[in-house]
């Protein structure tokens, strides 16, 4: 199921980047009118920045259409930042991180029940360059041919931690970090490359698919990344709308 879900997210990101603006006015009007007729439960989703487009343009509208009495509000950032926000009192109902570490930390700290965690999605780490222009680089191995490399901060951004692991295993991390600019989340990295502020960058496949201004050169080499890129999701124990939160998590698991 993970591979099918990844395919849906990738396809959705590419299609929606072109078609999402087409019918927003009518659907928004009908949604507003329906909301007036019934009470609405609002849940807060804290999710990795790499999933923002998939959620806002496809998954949340689909869920709200099927569950008229539930509204989902999203908060998107690096998984490390979201973990800290939850620990500091953020009233999140559902958490979806771009790595297992942040989810495991919240399980250990009793914010989430281990049995509620679902490994929902497996992503890929890719090397991107601006769509326009001639790239100096062609692979993870020769990335230091670029003068500016965009990466997520390994301390708080899972995509950055994955990049560090990849380049460490390829024996070129020390050279890479000398040319790296570190973003606060993976979306910032994507935007730097899309705008040409960086010659190349490391993001997830879902991010690359969501932008028409970048192109993927290659996936991370086999065996360079020992840690699977897993996106776990779970409802938080202290959610004030646990039934609605559980319903949303179950929806995400459906095919």
What role is predicted for each listed range?
Residues 1-24:
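Sec-dependent N-terminal signal peptides of Gram-positive bacterial secreted proteins and lipoproteins
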Residues 69, 91-92, 198:
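Short, high-confidence coil segments that cap the C-terminus of an alpha-helix
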Residues 116-125:
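Short, glycine-/small- and polar/acidic-enriched structural segments
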Residues 67-73:
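A generic structural motif
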Residues 90-91, 114:
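Short glycine-enriched, charge-decorated loop/helix-capping segments at active-site entrances
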Residues 21-65, 80, 87, 99-100, ...:
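Exported/periplasmic ABC-transporter solute-binding proteins
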Residues 74-83, 92-106:
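Ligand-binding clamshell of periplasmic/extracellular solute-binding protein-like
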Residues 113-116, 221:
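Short, P/G- and charge-enriched loop/turn segments at secondary-structure junctions
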